[in-house]
Amino acid sequence: MSVPDYMQCAEDHQTLLVVVQPVGIVSEENFFRIYKRICSVSQISVRDSQRVLYIRYRHHYPPENNEWGDFQTHRKVVGLITITDCFSAKDWPQTFEKFHVQKEIYGSTLYDSRLFVFGLQGEIVEQPRTDVAFYPNYEDCQTVEKRIEDFIESLFIVLESKRLDRATDKSGDKIPLLCVPFEKKDFVGLDTDSRHYKKRCQGRMRKHVGDLCLQAGMLQDSLVHYHMSVELLRSVNDFLWLGAALEGLCSASVIYHYPGGTGGKSGARRFQGSTLPAEAANRHRPGAQEVLIDPGALTTNGINPDTSTEIGRAKNCLSPEDIIDKYKEAISYYSKYKNAGVIELEACIKAVRVLAIQKRSMEASEFLQNAVYINLRQLSEEEKIQRYSILSELYELIGFHRKSAFFKRVAAMQCVAPSIAEPGWRACYKLLLETLPGYSLSLDPKDFSRGTHRGWAAVQMRLLHELVYASRRMGNPALSVRHLSFLLQTMLDFLSDQEKKDVAQSLENYTSKCPGTMEPIALPGGLTLPPVPFTKLPIVRHVKLLNLPASLRPHKMKSLLGQNVSTKSPFIYSPIIAHNRGEERNKKIDFQWVQGDVCEVQLMVYNPMPFELRVENMGLLTSGVEFESLPAALSLPAESGLYPVTLVGVPQTTGTITVNGYHTTVFGVFSDCLLDNLPGIKTSGSTVEVIPALPRLQISTSLPRSAHSLQPSSGDEISTNVSVQLYNGESQQLIIKLENIGMEPLEKLEVTSKVLTTKEKLYGDFLSWKLEETLAQFPLQPGKVATFTINIKVKLDFSCQENLLQDLSDDGISVSGFPLSSPFRQVVRPRVEGKPVNPPESNKAGDYSHVKTLEAVLNFKYSGGPGHTEGYYRNLSLGLHVEVEPSVFFTRVSTLPATSTRQCHLLLDVFNSTEHELTVSTRSSEALILHAGECQRMAIQVDKFNFESFPESPGEKGQFANPKQLEEERREARGLEIHSKLGICWRIPSLKRSGEASVEGLLNQLVLEHLQLAPLQWDVLVDGQPCDREAVAACQVGDPVRLEVRLTNRSPRSVGPFALTVVPFQDHQNGVHNYDLHDTVSFVGSSTFYLDAVQPSGQSACLGALLFLYTGDFFLHIRFHEDSTSKELPPSWFCLPSVHVCALEAQA
């Protein structure tokens, strides 16, 4: 044997060994799910008997250990259970072949085997098999345990038959000689007929039968066979097998005396399969120790498993003292054989477990000392770790704590030996933790603050350093920080100046990746590492609470959120001064803090380190009321004297507040330090009264802070200034987060804005918001955030630069494009009298006169809580600085009629004034690409607008009495409507920015008239089909063509009557129109149509007919008769569509 089982105990001799292995590719999760269920069937009662069969499961077992199965039958693999995945019938033959290959590995010793197949369905599943079990999946397999019980019963049948065969051999029969692997060559050529040889054969067979009886649950019979074997083997000096017989006798006696087993707590393997360690159970490699089943427990009915009576058992069974003596004798026989080292080691371990139950520690230590010196060939690193770990556990089991710690540490160092390709730092760390009690080392810093130091500081520091290094290498920097913090806090007095520097530097390196906290760290084994506060870094000697500054007082007003209240309150805070000042820490101080305001505490500290100490995140720890600590940072010189430090915070509720201590971050480690735990501290009191206060509002925006500080004329202080740079027409949302960082709900909020820039003409709303959505979230509870969105939309008038474009036109530059290196800067160059030939360089570069600036102030007045009742409010002002650059603007606007009377073409000359290529698009046209400084014309076909349907504006209701203002307002309203319908947008792909291009300031009266939908809507129908746009009506020569003219009156007054004349003509496409068509076109009836008066929103129609005598293309021109009625209306009201009729040859 080459692989020892360090978890062996005496009761394992009565178990049957069953190997459970996967076949093919099976996930570890699925395998161990079934493996645990199989392990749950650890013992069964034999039918019609009081005997109990115990099973020991392995998911890996070295085949070379199986060769020792004749020497000790509990080492023989008698059962094989394989688990496999098979999802198709074509894979089944190969899977079954793999099962047979797996059986061949242990084939010489197997009693029976089973194959569990998951995933296969179909005809193969329906075929009855005893050695194969099919399951559709890993969830639907309820009969696994039942099949395992049947499998164990089949093992028992074979076991019982073998026991009976061996036990009933006649003395005259030839008994085979059982051998261990290394003996086979030694018996070649021996006289098999000699008496010595026969006794050897009989003695070994008796021992073998004893093993079988013990496994079959016949304890009394096994004792008898072991005694007979010992006598036979002792007579022939067969020492190896004599030792095995003695060990078997000891095992049977231990099972009798200690039915609860000898594994104890250290033998976690003895519990059910649910106790599988995560790391050990998930490895398939030689030498991996497995969790075993409890073979020493009685049956559930409490019946003794032995079929024999209790009579005579005491005579064959060894006493507890004799058990140990026989173990010593057996081990002494094993030691004679070099190849029996594993057997000797396991026997020592079994004896130690028995002695631990008997509480004979000194004798147990002798066995362990012997085990230490047993030579087991060249062990692998993993086997060394196992060996040292088990030695440590066994020493711990017998109460030798320091020696246990020694071997644990040796095992830990072996886990990370240089010869290991993948060092096991996690196992190393776990083992190092278990050595701490042996070195009188606790991981609770409170244990080092009471009394004198216990243990050897040098050894403890060495062990702490090893813990730090192991935790770092296993990828858990939080553990490294905690252990290093503990070392620095508890061992500071034992560290030299250089060691202090080294430890501090290491700690900073670790905390740069993982800061230290005050949270307990839970380790996988159930151990919890308590926090380590740095009460010595720095040392605090004096604490003093300070009064509030006057600048934090709220504003008082006569009417809450009134319009005429000054932002500077005349109220002067003057607390009542108490004259009974005391030095006691619990004395209340003679001033008050205000709820929600920043409060200050002064500490006098000094640095014990030989270098500059940087303390970050230093704040207060309080009780009595809710308190928000605002941390500070400081730097203390090396070994400094008393150094003043001011800590601030905000009380969140009213009442009495007590300053209990402070928290710090030193070397990246966060610490909570209580004043009661600081020796020699002085204070003038740490308790103060907190009066009710207002909520506190904190504003944060989505825009960057501005370097421009606005100075409103009202003298209000701007809390925050933000800036944004936009192109003209561009919109951006300013998202403001209103966070209530106070203690009271925010109940009232008023938002106002004031534009400080008045010289620029603004179109539309510069700043707009909807406060209702924000107020719907009120009252805003403490700690809550409300989002307030302000829309910033800049639409300025840059049309003044049209005059500058005219300068370029005067120079002969084409309006379709400007071939200039920097066209924009030349465009925006101010007009001067007499243009110079060579303008100075200063005018070419650095001229930013085209940028326009808008400035506004947003005021937030809010109140709530007790301050709201008392008439206080707070005021926050937000300054907004917007720089607007021109994007695109229109240099010329004109219109052209369209083919439809309800539409027209809007012609726009668009100029790109940016330095980037951009695209201009509308809702109905494709994008137009404009290079920097380029001007192009774009035509937009638009539906005409019904301006008369616009709702009345406030100006038309009498707010503006000036007719000029009324007309201006109407024009702006129409321009806004046209702008919204056109939807002209620009986009700069390189900057991913976009905006709107406005024509509001460029629409003159003529353009507006062309864009307006005529109040009289005329429709012409030929044979019932509308004629509009470019539609052509077809007819046949000689057939009358019905012509209908409809009028819809959308004006607010009655119109008509009207007389219309239809004039046909032909267009020769050369500018010549032929109206002489008397012989070609004939009217059925009159060529003049009459329409009666039409009321508002009414309709009227007139009918007529034409007869085309020849084929050809004809056009119908409808003329109005000039009379008093038609002259009163604008010409634009009489826009009839042209009619195009194609006369075709009549079909035969």
UniProtKB/Swiss-Prot annotation:
Cell location: Golgi apparatus, cis-Golgi network; Endoplasmic reticulum; Cytoplasm
Residues bearing the modification Phosphoserine: 566, 953
Tissue: Expressed at high levels in muscle and kidney and to a lower extent in brain, heart and placenta.
One Gene Ontology term, aspect cellular component: TRAPP complex
GO biological process: cerebral cortex development; endoplasmic reticulum to Golgi vesicle-mediated transport; neuron differentiation; vesicle coating; vesicle tethering
InterPro entries: TRAPP_II_complex_Trs120 (IPR013935)
Subunit architecture: Component of the multisubunit TRAPP (transport protein particle) complex, which includes at least TRAPPC2, TRAPPC2L, TRAPPC3, TRAPPC3L, TRAPPC4, TRAPPC5, TRAPPC8, TRAPPC9, TRAPPC10, TRAPPC11 and TRAPPC12. Directly interacts with IKBKB and MAP3K14.
Disease: Intellectual developmental disorder, autosomal recessive 13: A disorder characterized by significantly below average general intellectual functioning associated with impairments in adaptive behavior and manifested during the developmental period. Brain magnetic resonance imaging of MRT13 patients indicates the presence of mild cerebral white matter hypoplasia. Microcephaly is present in some but not all affected individuals.
Protein purpose: Functions as an activator of NF-kappa-B through increased phosphorylation of the IKK complex. May function in neuronal cells differentiation. May play a role in vesicular transport from endoplasmic reticulum to Golgi.
Family statement: Belongs to the NIBP family.
Protein name per its UniProtKB record: Trafficking protein particle complex subunit 9
Protein's organism: Homo sapiens (Human)
Gene from which this protein is expressed: TRAPPC9
